[in-house]
């Protein structure tokens, strides 16, 4: 099938990308942000190397039918690509028993609205990375203040969708010991809790005191 959806890699089996589910996890090229602790900076390039086609993804899912609970679209940032809803619809058409998950940083709220508002492209579960409070976010990911506002608009929209029973939502953040994000965790937890959700905290590994990735 034809879809603007560049795939940088596929993990055929994963037990860590959707809590409680065994998934195939699809990683797209391209990410608009440059998180200081990013372990996969090669995926930030939207024109980076691809390793599989959408047809090959469908073949893999067919070969594992009955073994997987779901497919998760991750990145990079999958909402960058116009082909995402097309691919989700094709998964639902071919594999109606398979759940669909999405990892996103929320920087494109309009596209998240489009996905969720259409039942044929709506994810069953979303893992939303709330990287920082709005005023801190530009320094952590290299976005503009407008980009930070967009990310929090996505949080508000997805929290409402979750409360309405349209999808499951996990909100998570990444922090490192001794950094500004660790200091702000209590406030970030309060902000997420005010939307009826819990914040999952992931601790960055192989980073320096400023959070920059130093691993090999």
Regions found by a protein language model. Name each.
Residues 41-72, 82:
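Conserved alpha-helical substructure of the radical SAM core
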Residues 8, 27, 172:
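Residues in well-ordered beta-strands of folded domains
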Residues 1-12:
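N-terminal "domain-start" segment that seeds a small globular fold
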Residues 25-27, 70-74, 101:
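Short, conserved beta-strand segments within well-ordered enzyme catalytic domains
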Residues 77:
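Conserved G/P- and acidic residue-centered "switch" motifs that form tight phosphate/ATP-binding loops
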Residues 58-67, 80-215:
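Conserved AdoMet/S-adenosylmethionine-binding subsite of the radical SAM
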Residues 11-52:
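Canonical Radical SAM [4Fe-4S] cluster-binding loop centered on the CxxxCxxC motif
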């Amino acid at each position: 099938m034809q879809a603007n959806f560049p795939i940088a890699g596929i993990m055929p089996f994963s037990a860590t990308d959707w809590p409680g589910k065994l998934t195939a996890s699809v990683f797209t090229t391209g990410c608009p942000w440059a998180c200081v602790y990013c372990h996969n900076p090669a995926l930030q390039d939207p024109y980076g190397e691809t390793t599989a086609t959408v047809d090959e993804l469908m073949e893999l899912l067919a070969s594992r039918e009955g073994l997987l609970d779901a497919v998760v679209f991750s990145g990079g940032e999958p909402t960058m690509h116009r082909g995402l809803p097309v691919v989700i619809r094709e998964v639902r058409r071919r594999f109606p028993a398979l759940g669909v998950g999405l990892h996103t940083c929320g920087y494109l709220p309009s596209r998240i609205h489009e996905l969720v508002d259409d039942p044929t492209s709506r994810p069953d579960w979303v893992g939303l990375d709330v990287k920082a409070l709005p005023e801190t976010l530009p320094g952590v990911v290299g976005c503009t203040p407008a980009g930070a506002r967009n990310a929090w608009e996505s949080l508000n929209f997805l929290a409402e969708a979750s409360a309405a029973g349209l999808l499951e939502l996990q909100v998570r953040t990444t922090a490192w010991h001794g950094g500004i994000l660790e200091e702000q965790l209590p406030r970030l937890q309060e902000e997420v809790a005010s939307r009826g959700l819990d914040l999952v905290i992931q601790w960055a590994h192989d980073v320096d005191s400023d959070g920059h990735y130093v691993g090999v």
